[in-house]
Curated annotation (Swiss-Prot):
The MIF2 homology domain II targets centromeres and binds the alpha satellite DNA in vivo. Residues 636-658 are annotated as: MIF2 homology domain II. This is Centromere protein C. Oligomer. Component of the CENPA-NAC complex. Its main location: nucleus.
Length: 705
């Protein structure tokens, strides 16, 4: 403790700045340390600080003192401050005046002399060309500085490019016009000489056309001038005329006189009468439009599609159909038919046509004239056999409804029923055998064998005779078969099932393709069946037909796609002797319809699937653009593109090109350098082939170069 107190006492004695505060330690105040120190103080009052500063000596320059006085006195005095020593000053002008800028050339000083070149100083060619290059550079620079290269262009134009020297010994002839004024004088002299010496027709034609060139031009010019004058005169005359003179035909007569127009009489004109163009009587809407022969081109294009309209020319419709056709209000449901119970005796349904009077008028009803069968009824086509108490009296009627494109029902005679020449029609004969429905294809002979009753045979023969007559009429016109959609059928099916005298109808049509026709002809040669009947019947003869059905079904499986079309588009002809039997077979036939429709739908669904799979195979076989330049190796797709490092062409590395197929040249190999075994610097060139060994010679030949 004694040591600490001793050191502190020493510190207080030896420290000379202990009595000064921080403000008194500036460098200026340190100069005054030689003066005696003021008494020490410990307080920090502001007043003591001021007194301390005032007592201390202050050295100040005279300039600073004057500035301080001026600021304090607030006197406007220009204080001369010393300039900044590092400030850049302008160079003195050496007591010369600055020249004013002017665009005029100074004539006081002579222009600089252009550089010259003396070739005699350079005997050596190397020195000569080096000096000449320097001279050109100096001359260009001098021209840029003086501007003589721009000003003297007009005075000294650049020399023209010399032409290529021609072949020695040849002199170019000056150009001369081949067609001159003397040509016309020669032509006139030739015309005069033609009278004495005849020339060829072609030469005379050319000379005549050349001679009349100028005259025709003059005539055209004269005519245009004359027409302009005439038009101006006509306009002046029209403006000079009064209103009374121009009323009526006055202006027209004036124009006819001045322009020399021939007047014509309208009464003398007669318009020719065209046979194919006829007037339309819009008031007579209740009557049928008159028969009109269509144009030959349209008739060829629409052959077979408008056969109903063509058939109207040969058969006049019944009065019932006329009323139905001319009705301004068509029925709401175009496919519905009135019930047969609501008809009065003697009335006839609009879709029913009696065939017997028509069949009597048809000539030449021989069975050999029957053509190919194409049943083209779009909605309903059936033959209904009605029998009463007297079996001898058979009334057969044909029911058919046809709807035209514009929505009006058009009723006409049934197109065709049977085919006698093919002698075979595939019918859907619904049989009830042991509680099962069987679809049996039957020929006319098979139908006649299976019908046990002779009365039924007589009825069938009598009915088929009537059908043959209708088939002969239908065979005269070329028709096109078409398939009826099943969605448009149920309205008629429901209406026909209500009436007891109508058998249920199946809405299937026969296909008229060439394959089906050839198939029918082959069947006709195999089975020489009885030609006395021409329709298939639905017969309830279970045991006999069941045996026959197995044979026919086996044949049908072998026939392929032709019979499938027949089965889809087959037509059923129902013949029964009593109304009770018809009512009994109604549920059985409805089940058969569902079965046949289901089969046809299955076949129609299978066909587009086959076509789709075939198109899919073709599409899958096509090369994919995404897989271009790749191949599959070991289940992994790898690139077939040629990959190489940057080739060193200065060492002889390069790609080898060649034509290995009928296209452009392709890369067939690569030639690269590889380090040798012994020396490091030496590299041997190697060849790598990208093609098969078949083109090895081609690769080696390309690697030699």
């Amino acid at each position: 403790m004694a040591d600490v107190s001793r050191s502190s006492s020493l510190y207080t004695e030896e420290d000379p700045l202990q009595a000064y505060s921080g403000l008194s330690l500036f460098p200026r105040t340190l100069k005054s340390l030689s003066n005696p120190l003021p008494p020490s103080y410990q307080s920090e009052d502001l007043q003591q600080t001021h007194t301390l500063l005032q007592s201390m000596p202050f050295e100040i320059q005279s300039e600073h003192q004057e500035q301080a006085k001026a600021i304090l006195e607030d006197v406007d005095v220009d204080v001369q401050l010393n300039p900044i020593p590092n400030k850049r000053e302008r160079r003195p002008g050496l007591d010369r005046k600055r020249k004013s800028f002017s665009l005029h050339l100074t004539t006081s000083q002579p222009p600089p002399v252009a550089p010259s070149f003396d070739p005699s100083k350079y005997p050596r060619s190397e020195d000569f060309f080096a000096a000449y290059d320097k001279f050109e550079l100096a001359n260009r620079e001098w021209q840029k500085q003086t501007g003589s290269s721009v000003i003297d262009i007009q005075e000294n134009p650049p020399s023209r490019r010399p032409r290529r020297p021609g072949i020695p010994g040849r002199k170019r002839r000056p150009f001369k016009e081949s067609f001159t004024d003397s040509y016309f004088t020669d032509v006139i002299n030739l015309e005069a000489s033609e009278k004495e010496i005849p020339i060829a027709s072609e030469q005379s034609l050319e000379s005549a056309t050349a001679a009349h060139v100028t005259t025709v031009d003059r005539e055209v010019d004269d005519s245009t001038v004359d027409t302009d004058k005439d038009l101006n005169n006509v306009l002046k005359d029209l403006l000079a005329c009064s209103r009374e003179e121009l009323e009526g035909d006055g202006a027209i007569k004036l124009l006819e006189e001045r322009l020399q127009i021939k007047s014509f009489n309208i009464e003398k004109f007669s318009i020719p009468e065209f046979q194919d163009v006829r007037k339309m009587n819009l008031k007579a809407s209740g009557s049928n439009p008159p028969n009109r022969k269509s144009l030959s081109d349209i008739q060829n294009i629409l052959k077979g599609t408008n056969r109903v309209a063509v058939r109207k020319n040969s058969h006049s419709p019944s009065p019932q159909t006329i009323k139905h056709f001319s009705s301004p209000n068509p029925p709401v449901d175009q496919f519905s038919f009135p019930d047969i119970h609501n008809l009065l005796p003697g009335d006839q349904q609009p879709s029913e046509v009696n065939v017997q009077p028509i069949a009597k008028d048809i000539p030449n009803t021989s069975p050999t004239n029957v053509g190919t069968v194409d049943v083209a009824s779009p909605f309903n086509d059936s033959v209904v056999k009605r029998s009463g108490e007297d079996d001898s009296h058979i009334h057969s009627g044909i029911h058919r409804s046809h709807l035209s494109r514009d929505g009006n029902p058009d009723i006409c005679v049934m197109d065709s029923i049977s085919n006698r020449s093919s002698a075979m029609l595939q019918k859907n004969v619904d049989m009830r055998t042991k509680g099962k429905e069987v679809d049996v294809p039957m020929s006319e002979s098979g139908a006649n064998r299976n019908t046990g009753d002779r009365e039924n045979d007589a009825e069938i023969n009598e009915e088929t005779d009537n059908l043959e007559r209708l088939a002969e009429c239908a065979s005269k016109e070329v028709t096109r078969p078409f398939t009826v959609e099943e969605d448009s059928i149920p309205y008629q099916q429901g209406a026909s099932s209500k009436s007891p005298n109508r058998a249920p109808e199946q809405y299937n049509t026969m296909g008229g393709s060439l394959e089906h026709a050839e198939h029918n002809q082959g069947l006709h040669e195999e089975e020489n069946v009885n030609t006395g009947s021409a329709s298939g019947l639905q017969v309830e003869n279970a045991p006999e037909v069941h045996k026959y059905s197995h044979k026919q079904t086996n044949k049908r499986r072998k026939r392929g796609s032709s019979d499938s079309n027949v089965k889809k588009r087959s037509k059923t002809v129902h013949g029964e002797t009593g109304g009770d039997k018809q009512m009994k077979t109604l549920p059985h036939e409805s089940r058969a319809k569902k079965q046949t429709k289901g089969k046809s739908n299955e076949r129609e669904e299978k066909k587009p699937k086959k076509t789709l799979t075939h198109e899919g195979k073709l599409f899958s076989c096509r090369k994919s653009l995404a897989a271009a330049g790749t191949k599959i190796e070991g289940g992994v797709r790898r690139s077939t593109r040629i990959k190489s490092r940057p080739l060193e062409y200065w060492r002889g590395e390069r790609f080898l090109y060649g034509r290995i197929h009928e296209s452009l040249t392709t890369v067939i190999g690569i030639k690269y350098a590889s380090p040798g075994e012994g020396k490091r610097d030496s590299r041997a060139s190697k060849v790598k082939s990208f093609v098969s060994d078949e083109y090895k010679k081609l690769v080696d030949f390309a690697a030699l170069h």
